[in-house]
């Protein structure tokens, strides 16, 4: 516990919080161009081929972003929108690609959680209403 005199001399130091997604630079999303689209394997207890893309953002920073959902149409030079959000079992992947925006198509035949995957409402449901 500092004395009053010590506080007068030095003051309190402000704790600096570290951001989880520094490449976004305090923006909610950023646009970028895919430089490489590939699959990678997750950490120890899990086993899969996770789809990821290396993206050069509009601020010239290059990041690795996860492609959510089943199937995608991304290739090199595709323009994508990325948001923050890490993938727990992929080290170094701290961003997600937003489905259904720019060059990224939405997930086809998606019935639930459609807004998260850029899927339109199915025609059969729309006709009933």
From Swiss-Prot:
Modified sites of kind 3-methylthioaspartic acid: 89
Example GO BP: translation
GO molecular function: rRNA binding; structural constituent of ribosome; tRNA binding
rRNA-binding recorded as keyword: yes
Keywords of the record: Methylation, Ribonucleoprotein, Ribosomal protein, RNA-binding, rRNA-binding, tRNA-binding
Region feature Disordered, mapped onto this chain: 101-129
Signal peptide: none
One GO cellular component, as annotated: small ribosomal subunit
Highest rank taxon of the organism: Bacteria
NCBIfam families: rpsL_bact
Subunit and interaction comment: Part of the 30S ribosomal subunit. Contacts proteins S8 and S17. May interact with IF1 in the 30S initiation complex.
Record family assignment: Belongs to the universal ribosomal protein uS12 family.
Function: With S4 and S5 plays an important role in translational accuracy. Interacts with and stabilizes bases of the 16S rRNA that are involved in tRNA selection in the A site and with the mRNA backbone. Located at the interface of the 30S and 50S subunits, it traverses the body of the 30S subunit contacting proteins on the other side and probably holding the rRNA structure together. The combined cluster of proteins S8, S12 and S17 appears to hold together the shoulder and platform of the 30S subunit.
Protein name, entry field: Small ribosomal subunit protein uS12
Organism field: Chlorobium luteolum (strain DSM 273 / BCRC 81028 / 2530)
Taxonomic placement: Bacteria, Pseudomonadati, Chlorobiota, Chlorobiia, Chlorobiales
